[in-house]
Amino acid sequence: MSDHEQHQAALNRFIELANELAADGVSKGVLASALMRAAAVYATFSVAGNKGALTPEGIERATTFFKDNLALVQKARQQAAEQPKEQLKEKAKE
C-alpha cells in the first residue's frame, strides 16, 4: 500500500471513529477539540518520544503543517461546492 493509500485509510478510520462518537452523543466541538489534542500528542510523540517535548521551532512547524492542511481541506471543499454550479451552467448552455 502506498503512503497516499495508507494516509487515506488512516484518515477514514479517524473519521469513522469520530462519527461513531458523534452518534453516541459526543458534541462536534468536543470531538474537534479531542482530535486536535490527539494530533498534538501524537505529533509530539512522533518527534520527541514518550518523554520529550517539541521546541518552539517544532511547535511552529507543527502549527504551520496543520494550517497548510486546513487550507487544503477548505480549498477542496470550495471546489466541490462549485462543481455543481459549473455543471448547472453547462446544462443551461445546452
Which sequence ranges carry the predicted segments?
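Solvent-exposed interaction surfaces and binding hotspots enriched for charged
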Residues: 1-94
